[in-house]
Amino acid sequence: MPTYNQLVRFGRKSKIRKTKSPALESNPFKSGVCLVVKTVTPKKPNSALRKIATVRLSNKRTVNAYIPGEKHSVKEHDRVLVRGGQVPDLPGVKYHIVLGAYDIAGVKGRKQGRSRYGATRKQVAATKK
């Protein structure tokens, strides 16, 4: 416990919190250009081929970003929008690519959780009585 005089002289130091997505620089999203699209295997005990892309952001930083959903249209040199969000079983992947933004199409045939995958609502035909 500090003395009153110590508080007057030095004050209280607030804890510095470390950000989980430093490359975004406190922005919700950053745009970038896709450099490489590849598949990686997750940590134990999971098994899959997860799709990731190496992206050069508009602030000149290079990050690995996860491509969510089934099937994707991400190619080299595509413009992408990147948001924060880690992938639990992929070490070093701290970002997600936003589907349905810029050059990236949304997941086709998606009925639930559409907003996360950039899928549009299927129009139901009006029936006559």
Swiss-Prot record:
GO biological process, one term: translation
InterPro entries listed in its UniProt record: NA-bd_OB-fold, Ribosomal_uS12, Ribosomal_uS12_bac
Entry keywords, A to Z: Ribonucleoprotein, Ribosomal protein, RNA-binding, rRNA-binding, tRNA-binding
Keyword Cytoplasm in record: no
One Gene Ontology molecular-function label: structural constituent of ribosome
A UniProt-annotated Pfam family: Ribosom_S12_S23
Keyword field contains rRNA-binding: yes
GO CC aspect terms: small ribosomal subunit
Record SUPFAM superfamilies: Nucleic acid-binding proteins (SSF50249)
Similarity field: Belongs to the universal ribosomal protein uS12 family.
Family matches, as PANTHER family: 30S RIBOSOMAL PROTEIN S12 FAMILY MEMBER (PTHR11652)
Function: With S4 and S5 plays an important role in translational accuracy.
Subunit structure: Part of the 30S ribosomal subunit. Contacts proteins S8 and S17. May interact with IF1 in the 30S initiation complex.
HAMAP family, sorted: Ribosomal_uS12_B (MF_00403_B)
Protein known as: Small ribosomal subunit protein uS12
Gene source species: Rickettsia typhi (strain ATCC VR-144 / Wilmington)
Organism phylogeny: Bacteria, Pseudomonadati, Pseudomonadota, Alphaproteobacteria, Rickettsiales
